[in-house]
Amino acid sequence: MSSTVTSVFTFKVESTFDEWAAIFDSKEATRRHREFNIQPLYRGCSDDDPQKIIVIHQHPEGNIEKFVEANGDWMASHRVDLSTMEKAAWTWTDNSNVQFKAA
């Protein structure tokens, strides 16, 4: 049985969304995400504040924390204001291998 987490992050950037997205969509960012088995699902910016970003990822439990710990300096160097980062996590468990018995 394995747990998959869907993480929703919001944070501010000190650049434009397009500048930040170019880095997020880069081969280097893809390599770093894959290293921690993180699948980006969505990224966008707020209509009210174009410097407020939302990112949604899916990953094994605990991997996003390892990613941020290993890559925090790299993220900050791309003008991400880590002090504004907020996270919500949504978990589901894959029970596809569980055998159910009739009562």
Predicted regions and their residues:
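Glycine-rich beta-strand-turn "strand-cap" elements at beta-sheet edges
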Residues: S2-S3, R34-I53, A76-A103
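Short amphipathic alpha-helical segments
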Residues: S15-L41, D73-A76
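Generic "edge-of-domain/loop-turn" microfeature
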Residues: T16-D18, G62-I64, N97
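Short, well-ordered beta-strand segments in beta-rich or mixed alpha/beta enzyme
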Residues: V5-K12, L41-G72
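Positively charged, hydrophobic/aromatic-enriched amphipathic segments
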Residues: M1-T4, T16
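Acidic, low-complexity intrinsically disordered regions
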Residues: T16, A70, E86-A88
